[in-house]
């Protein structure tokens, strides 16, 4: 099946589910197709991109997206404790709300409340993760200021990888998965994944003499179903369904303050997340033209209550989201390709209730615009000639609350000589305020404006012998940043982030290596004096290494995180080591073991919250 350079570009940036899983692609230009890796036409994608396959995830023996993200370049992670606790990611120094997170090319519903708690998403159904750094709002719209992460759960149509797995580890951590992914006839495929996980956890917020002996655990049950079919050589379709139900404990205890008239409070709370989603996509592709239509619906309920009480006694936030996306690409000739997208999004806060608490009586969210709708129209053009590639994109978002937002991006790539390429890009981006920013009960600020940014970056990449390397410098200016002050959120923030990244990948005999270094200066310019942006470090380093020999696969992951600040509170730098081992008993059975935080490092990601010490997990996989 023939795909143009732009078709692949659009696929990777707009809707990678269909295109990146193509097994055979024929074009007039050189294509790099590496098994279980990112597929692209040479020079087609002028952005820094990393793809993580399900094989990579299994090799890491990751429990969650948190485990995966912390191994990727220019991502800092932070969570309030262990498995299942609230977590955030910071890409290139941007905030947790300035990175766009997609599932199969569609926004996660929770984003309308501000930020994505990716620790709640089941990892056992993931086929691939595409991670793009830099501003991409001219393709995706709101939130794509510092990067885009697309979590892909749709399998390729010829995937045949059914398995059963079970494991046990520290803190009474139990996990099991039953997964079927296989062809069921000519051009037909089914996928089904059922997973369960539970851990007792540990005390994530120890307050001596107040909550001694408390444990804050996590439990999840999840299901993913998918069916796809090639109706003809040119026409295909897919339908999917997913649901998960999670429960996690956290601590809301506090010491009393006699001066304020408060007393010690020991309070354990429980959060519950219930998600249901379905999606349908149809794709037509013939010669130089490709078109895809995708419809998706998602509903998520979040409950927050005192442990042991019923859900009716606590907070309840319910979100509904509907997406309709239509993408088209056309190759005019061997040099020039064009494409465009139209997407409609309807976001509804179906329920927004805050139960009575120490802070006051019961309250309800009362959005002025509910549901909130957004229509985005985007266009992209790419011209490739000899050693040069040029790309330009523009997008307009019409929102029934914020009006019009237009973003654009230009990029150029120059193959200096064989194996070396220089790329330069500049683009604008924005982030629309969330319902929490706008309508948090008692602190409503309905007139907030979107955050805005300008991003410029320069990259040089090369392949020399066994070494594949890239150096990237970037400069991101963010204005109208939303900051909590006084009676609520205000557009008074400003940030300036300069950074440089180094990626090196190489193989030495039986060992494959990935080195990531980053240095940045994340400056908060909102106050009278410049300060370091909260929870962002200036320095970071990561090394992932894996060796395969005989029936063994051994791995190690190293992470260095520089010091961070939260106001005047300093969080020291730390280094962590994880080790993994897998033994293939035969063609069907694997035995796996993982040692996390192997040297039992004591560190903090958020001030006052404990992190996991040394932990082990052992598991067995059976393929059929």
From Swiss-Prot:
Location of motif TonB box in this chain is 29-36
Q: Name one GO cellular component term.
A: pore complex
Is Membrane there in the keyword field?
yes
Predominant place of localization:
membrane
Name the Pfam families on file: Plug, TonB_dep_Rec_b-barrel
User: Alphabetically, which GO biological process terms does the record hold?
Assistant: monoatomic ion transport
Q: Which UniProt keywords apply?
A: Cell outer membrane, Ion transport, Membrane, Porin, Signal, TonB box, Transmembrane, Transmembrane beta strand, Transport
The family database entries (PROSITE patterns) matched by this protein are listed as: TONB_DEPENDENT_REC_1 (PS00430), TONB_DEPENDENT_REC_2 (PS01156), TONB_DEPENDENT_REC_3 (PS52016)
A Gene Ontology molecular-function term?
porin activity
Q: What InterPro entries does this protein's entry cite?
A: B12_transptr_BtuB, Plug_dom, Plug_dom_sf, TonB-dep_rcpt-like, TonB-dep_rcpt_b-brl, TonB_box_CS, TonB_rcpt_b-brl_sf, TonB_rcpt_CS
Give membrane topology per the record.
Answer: Multi-pass membrane protein
Motif TonB C-terminal box, per the record, lies over: 607-624
Q: Where is the TBDR plug domain?
A: 40-154
Which residues are the signal sequence here?
Answer: 1-22
Q: Where in the cell is it found?
A: Cell outer membrane
Q: Which residues form the TBDR beta-barrel domain?
A: 159-624
The cross-references to HAMAP family, in alphabetical order and at most eight, read: BtuB
Q: What does this protein do?
A: Involved in the active translocation of vitamin B12 (cyanocobalamin) across the outer membrane to the periplasmic space. It derives its energy for transport by interacting with the trans-periplasmic membrane protein TonB.
> Which family does the record assign?
Belongs to the TonB-dependent receptor family. BtuB (TC 1.B.14.3.1) subfamily.
Mind telling me what this protein is named? Answer: Vitamin B12 transporter BtuB
Taxonomy-wise, where does this protein's organism fall, top ranks first? Answer: Bacteria, Pseudomonadati, Pseudomonadota, Gammaproteobacteria, Vibrionales
